[in-house]
Amino acid sequence: MVPNKFKLAVLVSGRGSNLQAIIDSIEKNALQAEIALVVSNVKDAYALERAHKHGLEGLFLDPKSYPDRNSYEQDLMEKIQSKSVDLICLAGYMRILGKHFIEAFSDRIINIHPSLLPAFPGLNVQKRALEHGARFSGCTVHY
């Protein structure tokens, strides 16, 4: 690892446009980081293909293959901890993480949410914003 670079784990569920933005920023030296691990909870998420195209380790962890949420999150935690990451980026990750996971990585998780919170939490936020008649929208990045 190059000194003074953050070691990242990126959690994804879809196309990976946020992952690509992170990769691009690293490649342009605009972000002093390296991606140690990309994990998806969706088998055919294009984000995993993006990761592999850039030589990054990408894993699919199927939440349905675990007996319960805690078992899934425990395995996810172990995989992340094995990479000694400094920061976890939830970049289009469409699962709500439990208290135990959040506490294990206290002050080391950053989330990108595709709406201006608290106006539109949850899923399908842009659609809901349009249906609500919102005059503007945006995204929220919270730590």
Model-flagged regions — what are they?
Residues 1-143:
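One-carbon transfer enzymes
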